[in-house]
Amino acid sequence: MNGDSLLPYYTAQSGSSMSMFNTTMGRLQRQLYKGEYDIFKYAPIFGSDFIQITKRGEVIDVHNRVRMVTMGIARTSPILPLPDVMLLARPATGCEEYAGHGQATKRKKRKAAKNLELTRLLPLKFVRISVHNHEKQQLRLKFATGRSCYLQLCPALNTRDDLFAYWEKLIYLLRPPMESNSSTCGIPAEDMMWMPVFQEDRRSLEAVDLQGKGDQDQVSIRSLHMVSEVCGATSAAYAGGEGLQHDFHKPTNVLNVSIPKTSTELAEEPATGVTKEAAAAGAAAGAATGTVAGALSVAAANSAPGQVSVAIAGVATIGAGGSKSNMAIAGTASMAPNSTKVAVAGAAGKSSEHVSSTSMSLSREGSMSLAIAGVELTSRTAAETDMDAAAGLPVSTRQSKSSLSGQHGRERTQASAEACKEGRERREKDKALGRSSRRRRTGESRHKTRGDKIARKSSSRSSFSHRASRDGKKEKGCSSPGSSRHGESHKGVSHTPISKESRTSHKSGRSSSTTSSGSSKRLGRISSFLRNVRANLTTKAVGTPHGRDVDIMAKTVERSTNVANAETAEGGQGLEMVGSMTPDIMETMTFETH
């Protein structure tokens, strides 16, 4: 073996598996060494001459010539442990070869510029090489397109006798599962059998992992889906033989909280520092929606070290059997280095009876203080509550407001315990009669029900409404002379029969079933009726000073508020008519009865 026939940089210590390349340069390698292709100028190539045969082993002759094929296996980079490219060449035009089994004869018609013509360059991952017949030294090449060809070794006279054994060893090195660093090395024959070219691998994306150990500088084509993990990977053949250091960074400031069922519990996930506190703030804000089914979305942005801004948006629904049909919540949160503040505003659907605002302060130690301010019949409005929440009032101030509201409600509830019992008894008695009367009457008769006991004892004549007179006749009402004379003395003031059922209905909160448009119309009618009732009270209380009438009205309003609050606590539903005039009207009529 002459030193000139070896590649300049190749030695036997380059790799045990590459010892087969420590042979004399073949025709293909000598031709490429001339520099026709720079990538193969110093590439070690193991090549031999073959003749093309059929599957049955018959020689294929085209125009009475044997088809000669020179196949070479090359390694394009010295750092690759295995070869990665297969080269196919044929005799150039002007150089014809006729080969037999174990013998070769040449006849040159003219002097050719080159002996071989390179026709194919295929990565070994797209080719499966196998032994077709060991005795006849036949190989089988199966390409990724599905086509196959069969080659029979045709060595020269001066070649080694164990040349085919080297090919078998090379095939064995390319067949095992890939555990090398090169992605362009040959894929195992069994795995490559049914894989078409450029067809996506049907394996699950979760099962696909990067193949290789140590300094991985190339990846398999089967891992090309995983863009985030193979970014920056390249072939060492075109990088000057230098490996690349891969450092796949993962985002650290990403917060993604998904809560299928809104609750106060947060999934146990590894989180540190800012991310953990932002997630805890989102979970605490989600508690405003209760335990109803819904979804809560939390988005966090890290504006500065130790500071996080959180935006919260969520929806909630209750089944057909529930009292509410939907619910919505929206809020913002800001986290300082030592504490977390959350402001949440929610709205409930179906009756639109309550709008609440929640403010929370969360410290690093884990203690949490929560204050809730809501809209009540006699408390602040929803707009004021939202303004306080947006302004960021201190927690102590909001807590004091909430506690005062709760104490006032408890006092009114205790004072109206007896009135609640009366209201319950009257509602049970009048439920059947109230349903039938509501269907037949419209307009002003909607505020009145049949079975009025007060109308049978005392009712006034009205010249303003004929419908009220007809209702009085149907219900067998008797007009009072005193009240009639009083009605004639006041010009422009109409008197209608006062029904006990109507007072009971207003007192028990029956008006919650009407719409907001109907309530606005009723307020206009009731305002005129209030003036009439006040006039009646003034006429009856002869010799009573004006200051007493004012006291009576104040007591009436206080009593009406107590009844409304007690019914809200029992039924769990708020009243729709929350105007301050409605309780005045209802309880004024009640005072006249008692």
UniProtKB/Swiss-Prot annotation:
One of its GO terms (biological process) is Golgi organization. Residues 510-521 have a biased composition (Low complexity). Keywords: Golgi apparatus. Residues 408-433, 442-455, 468-477 have a biased composition (Basic and acidic residues). It comes from the Eukaryota. It holds the Pfam family GARIL_Rab2_bd. Residues 396-406 have a biased composition (Polar residues). It is found in: Golgi apparatus. Interacts (via N-terminus) with RAB2B (in GTP-bound form). RAB2B effector protein required for the compacted Golgi morphology, probably through interaction with small GTPase RAB2B. This is Golgi-associated RAB2 interactor protein 4. It comes from Macaca fascicularis. The lineage of its organism: Eukaryota, Metazoa, Chordata, Craniata, Vertebrata.
